[in-house]
From Swiss-Prot:
UniProt protein name: Importin-8
Acidic residues composition bias: residue spans: 896-909
SMART domains attached to this UniProt entry: IBN_N
Biased composition (Polar residues): 910-921
InterPro entries (UniProt xref): ARM-like, ARM-type_fold, Importin-beta_N, XPO2_central
Gene: Ipo8
Length: 1010
């Protein structure tokens, strides 16, 4: 390859004027052998301009991601799709580690992504040498190679981070070498606090975290090595951050490597404690380790964390994520006697001076509220922000301490009440007090000492603050109303005041963060309080209008959920405003989808999805109002059209759900047109969404079968889609759905003249069976299509089987089909599939002109049917049991649980918990039933009903016994062949089936007579 030519093309991609020509040049070259290795040479060359190297790195990353994995040609095609040539792959494997070591950061990040893909596909099979290569550079005396080699090792560990234990063997073998190596390396680096040294330490910590965060490899970490690691973590957490970092702006300090290193050390110890070191909360393989961890390390680490909290109390700077992880660790320590004993003397100071301080309104909150209230709302309601927030972690620690340790709650409540009752206290501290009390609402509402005082607390301290001139106090007061919305009010006036104040804040307050909190409070009060719901009934239209305004302005997903819940609460009232509401939501959705920044902001996707869910809820609520559905249809079709036009595939599932709800009772001409549009989209990019399309396609077949059959194009579209799925690479789950749709069509159209379709359906499923089928579900589903065809017309099926020519599978197809069916009868699960199989076998045994293949399996037919009836009996028994259990659960009265740990129990907690876990594990293993759970459960596909699933449909017991009686009366010799193989037990079971069939016949006749 001509390197200069590639360099010029890459340079052209940076220039808007040359970009199209440059991209065309690259797209014509990338398949040429040696192109990918040439990109790597450009990337590592110091003689090439940096932007070109960066462009080359991005191009190589995209190539490796797309073309490194081996790909097979589509069915029926012989040309293999493009893959990077093996010679090129080998060159890249030989040089990419060096490339990562030598490259600057912005290029290195692209190369490490390449490396992850390569390791995922090639290690250990094609590339065991990567271990030796990384190890070589880790041992190099040149420290300049250490960061790159550690990044390579990180990619190796990340590849296996979430894999099951049995799949991690290649990694664990490699870590036998690497773990001692990086431990030794970090020990050497610890005394050096320079930026590069701490950067290396941080990377080693990230490797360790990825290794242990999902499973702790006990074969790699014995007590001695773990003790060394824990001392390393303790040292890093405890050491002083260089004082010169205080010169950096506070907003930028968390990104400094010294704080990041501390964060990762804390992340590790918190994870180890939570997942492996907390007796009573670990799986049995970690029982011994958890006892050792708690006894050996937990208190020592906690001592350092208490010191960090004290530094924060003394107003020293602590990075937010460090504080958060410290809270997470202490949260685990609260429940164990040994750690609680150390924590107990400090818990009041921690609660009042640290946790409380973190939970108060701060300068940065005020700044954001004033400068960008919409961003303030986004931050407060972002679950990802919550995950990393010290405020959330502090809240959790306080909640656990108050719940588990009896001395914590009364002292903290007294502290908060003192603040709330003193008019001279800083308003921000009042916010903190309300925040604390609201966070403990669930506990307070269960404690008789406190729950009777809550109503008075709301009346005296919350209602007045809803009228405060400070927006953040009004918002917090709404939040507290939300927290206590399930309170049993003794004075109806207080409840009315609460709901009125929430409504007033929603409709009249001028500050958007207050409106959002008021919306959540109002919805929660309405959902929890019947009187509140009734009281707000006259205002539903105004409330909905205001909520729509808020959603339009803030694009907040939580408010979208409020609308959704209120629609459910006021379903009758909402019907009258459903069209206006949906029209508003559709306008907001269109605005969001067509905004310039849509693709860049994930929140917009979440919010747009929330709108679609809300419209879906409206459709469900008004399903009994066809005149409203008709008006909503046009609005929804515009939304569907917009999503399909813009190919926003992340919303395909939601718009298909809308279309499904629009076709549940009738199907308009416009909805039939949508079928054709969906078919075109399906051909382009909806291939993997077939399972999401299935409920809608099922409606097209079952809701208006006359319209389906009135236009041959409709059936052709459905068959073509099924064929594409069954002949493509959609995966066996989707293929099961395609086969199910074919079965539904056959059963729905029995006796309605689709004879010309049956051979096409049969050929398709039998050809699929000749290719490799991994799951029994797909195999039985394909067989079921043929069984449905047998029920539709035995003559047509066997004529088709005689005519079918299957590729790579010579020989009579009829006998292959019958034999496969007989071999697989025990794989038919759920009610419908077993019923279909019984009906099919009944048709088979009753045939007068039987193919020889049926005679050959005579001995298997009745035993198979009896086995299927036994399965049906189990399904029915399980359903009855589940119904009884659900009924009994519903009748249980909630009992207040006292979850505090008494001092006498403390020392025994971990031992008894483990003993109980061990006993539970044993009893579960010993209580194995002969029947797998999956045999008892309905299959997912059974939700797609057929005429056989209706209450007044063919009864399988009567169908079978009638068929067998017919044979007995008409063909005694054949009857003897069928019953001769039966054992005495099977004959008894056959008689039970006869008895049950007669009982069902009598019941049906009685119902008919009534």
């Amino acid at each position: 390859m001509d390197l200069n030519r590639i360099i010029q093309a890459l340079k052209g991609t940076i220039d808007p004027k040359l970009r199209i020509a440059a991209e065309t040049e690259l797209n014509q070259s990338y398949k040429i052998i040696n192109f990918a290795p040439s990109l790597l040479r450009i990337i590592v060359s110091d003689h090439v301009e940096f932007p070109v190297r960066q462009a080359a790195a991005i191009y190589l990353k995209n190539m490796v991601t797309q073309y490194w994995p081996d790909r097979e040609p589509p069915p029926g095609e012989v040309i293999f799709p493009f893959n990077i040539h093996e010679n090129d792959r080998q060159q890249i494997r030989d040089n990419i580690v060096e490339g990562i070591i030598r490259s600057p950061d912005l290029v290195r990040v692209q190369l490490t992504m390449c490396l992850r893909v390569i390791i995922r596909h090639d290690f250990p099979g094609h590339w065991p040498a990567v271990v030796d290569k990384i190890d070589y550079y880790l041992q190099s005396p040149n420290s300049g190679s250490w960061l790159g080699s550690l990044l390579c090792l990180y990619q190796l560990v990340k590849t296996y981070e979430y894999k099951k234990a049995e799949e991690r063997e290649p990694l664990l073998a490699a870590m036998q070498i690497f773990l001692p190596r990086i431990q030794q390396q970090i020990l050497q680096l610890l005394p050096d606090a320079s930026h590069y040294s701490v950067l290396l330490q941080k990377q080693i910590l990230k490797i360790f975290y990825a290794l242990v965060q999902y499973a702790l490899p006990l074969q790699l970490v014995n007590h001695q090595t773990m003790t060394t690691w824990m001392e390393i973590f303790r040292t890093i957490i405890d050491r002083t951050v260089p004082p010169e970092t205080l010169q950096i702006d506070e907003d930028d300090r968390p990104e400094l490597v010294w704080w990041k290193c501390k964060k990762w050390a804390l992340h590790i110890v918190a994870r180890l404690f939570e997942r492996y070191g907390s007796p009573g909360n670990v799986t049995k393989e970690y029982f011994e380790f958890s006892e050792f961890f708690l006894k050996t390390y937990a208190v020592g680490i906690q001592q350092v964390l208490l010191k960090i909290l004290d530094q924060y109390r003394q107003k020293e700077y602590i990075a937010p994520r460090v504080l958060q992880q410290a809270f997470n660790y202490l949260n685990q320590g609260v429940v164990h006697a040994v750690t609680w004993k150390q924590m107990k003397p400090h818990i009041q100071n921690i609660s009042e001076d640290v946790i409380f301080s973190v939970m108060c309104y701060k300068d940065e909150d005020e700044e954001l509220w004033q400068e960008d209230p919409y961003e303030y709302i986004r931050m407060k309601f972002d679950i990802f922000e919550d995950y990393a927030s010290p405020t959330t972690a502090a809240q959790t620690l306080l909640y656990t301490a108050a719940k588990k340790r009896k001395e914590v709650l009364p002292k903290m409540m007294a502290f908060c009440y003192q603040i709330l009752t003193d008019p001279n206290f800083d308003p921000r501290k009042k916010d903190g007090a309300l925040h604390v009390i609201g966070s403990l609402a669930e506990i307070l509402l269960k404690k008789s000492l406190f729950k009777d005082q809550i109503e008075l607390f709301l009346q005296n301290h919350v209602f007045p603050l809803l009228m405060s001139n400070l927006g953040y106090l009004r918002a917090r007061s709404c939040w507290v109303l939300h927290a206590f919305s399930s309170l049993k009010f003794h004075n109806e006036l207080n409840l009315r005041n609460a709901v009125e104040l929430a409504k007033k804040s929603l409709i009249e307050d001028e500050e958007m963060p207050v409106k959002v909190e008021a919306a959540l409070a109002l919805q929660s009060l309405i959902s929890n309080q019947a009187q509140a719901k009734e009281h707000m009934k006259p205002y539903v239209r105004f409330i909905m209008q205001e909520l729509l305004h808020i959603v339009r302005e803030t694009e907040n997903d939580d408010v979208t959920n409020v609308i959704q819940k209120l629609i459910c609460e006021y379903s009758q009232d909402v019907a009258s405003i459903a069209v206006d509401t949906t029209q508003h939501l559709a306008e907001i959705f269109g605005k969001v989808l067509q905004s310039d920044e849509y693709e860049e902001i994930e929140d917009k996707t979440v919010m747009a999805m929330g709108i679609l869910h809300t419209i879906d809820t409206i459709l469900t609520v008004v399903e009994d109002h066809p005149e409203i559905i008709q008006q909503l249809e046009n609005i929804c079709l515009r939304i569907i059209d917009l999503v399909l036009q813009k190919h926003v595939i992340e919303f395909y599932e939601e718009i298909l759900s809308l279309a499904y709800n629009l076709t549940c009772h009738t199907i308009s001409p416009q909805m039939w047109q949508l079928l054709g549009i969906l078919y075109e989209v399906f051909q382009q990019d909806c291939f993997e969404y077939f399972t999401d399309m299935m409920p809608l396609l099922h409606n097209y077949v079952t809701v208006d079968t006359n319209a389906l059959l009135s236009n041959p194009k409709h059936l052709e579209v459905l068959f073509t889609m099924c064929r594409k799925v069954l002949c493509g690479e959609a995966g066996e789950d989707a293929e099961c759905y395609a086969a199910k749709l074919l079965e539904v069509i056959i059963l729905q159209c029995k006796g309605r003249g689709i004879d010309q379709c049956i051979p096409l359906f049969i050929q398709l499923v039998l050809e699929r069976l000749t290719r490799g089928v991994k799951t029994s579900e797909l195999r039985t589903m394909c067989l079921q299509v043929a069984i449905a065809a047998l029920y539709y017309s035995p003559e047509l099926l066997f004529h088709t089987l005689e005519q079918v020519q299957l590729p790579h599978n010579p020989g009579p197809v009829t006998s292959q089909f019958i034999n496969q069916w007989m071999n697989d009868t025990d794989y038919f699960l759920g009610h419908h599939d077993r019923k279909m199989c019984i009906i099919g076998l009944s048709v088979l045994l009753e045939l007068q002109n039987r193919p020889p293949a049926v005679d050959a399996v005579a001995a298997q037919i009745l035993p198979s049917i009896l086995f299927l009836f036994l399965g049906l009996k189990q399904v029915c028994a399980t359903r009855q049991t589940v119904n009884r259990e659900n009924h009994s659960k519903a009748e249980k009265v909630d009992i207040e649980e006292n979850e505090e740990i008494s001092s006498e129990e403390e020392e025994e907690t971990s031992v008894s918990a483990q003993a109980m876990q061990s006993q539970i594990g044993r009893s579960e293993e010993e209580d194995d039933d002969d029947w797998d759970e999956e045999v008892l459960e309905e299959t997912a596909l059974e939700g797609f009903s057929t005429p056989l699933d209706l209450d007044n449909s063919v009864d399988e017991y009567q169908f079978f016994t009638q068929a067998l009686l017919t044979v007995q009366n008409r063909d005694a010799a054949w009857y003897q062949l069928l019953v001769a193989p039966l054992s005495e037990d099977q004959k008894r079971k056959l008689q039970e089936v006869y008895t049950l069939a007669e009982h069902r016949r009598t019941l049906a006749a009685g119902q008919f007579h009534i």
